[in-house]
């Protein structure tokens, strides 16, 4: 599970980074990239410049930084990936509150949630990989020696 979770998390983080940075660039260059300006009516924004910069720099940046740290096996990679996953979910919550529902939001919220679940898997917080009883203290490594 650990090797699979690590590789899957790296792939998801790179995907999230590229997607958010690409969306940020498109939104900055094309003022929302085709998203109607009327979605911003109830916000303090008059254009998509600031939201696009936040998407590209903050969301894309944390996703990319977490992917790089995890790829390099840095000690802070789990924390960075957790921040990136929750950041993605918070971004989607804010989007839902401001502009309403779109199918892509389900995908990206799921991406953030899956990132957090994979971090929990890497940390062993989802339970032991091998079923044990209170009297059994043999770990997986000891059993395979």
Stretches with model-predicted labels:
Residues 1-145:
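Topology signature of small-to-medium multi-pass alpha-helical membrane proteins
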């Amino acid at each position: 599970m650990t090797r699979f979770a690590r590789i899957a998390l790296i792939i998801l983080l790179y995907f999230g980074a590229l997607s958010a940075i690409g969306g940020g660039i498109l939104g900055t260059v094309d003022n929302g990239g085709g998203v109607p300006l009327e979605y911003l009516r109830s916000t303090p924004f008059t254009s998509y410049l600031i939201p696009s910069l936040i998407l590209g720099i903050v969301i894309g940046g944390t996703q990319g930084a977490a992917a790089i740290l995890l790829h390099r096996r840095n000690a802070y990679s789990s924390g960075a990936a957790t921040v990136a996953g929750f950041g993605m979910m918070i971004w989607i919550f804010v989007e839902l509150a401001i502009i309403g529902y779109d199918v892509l939001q389900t995908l990206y919220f799921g991406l953030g949630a899956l990132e957090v679940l994979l971090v929990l898997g890497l940390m062993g917080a989802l339970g032991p990989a091998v079923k044990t009883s209170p009297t059994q203290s043999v770990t997986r490594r000891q059993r395979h020696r």
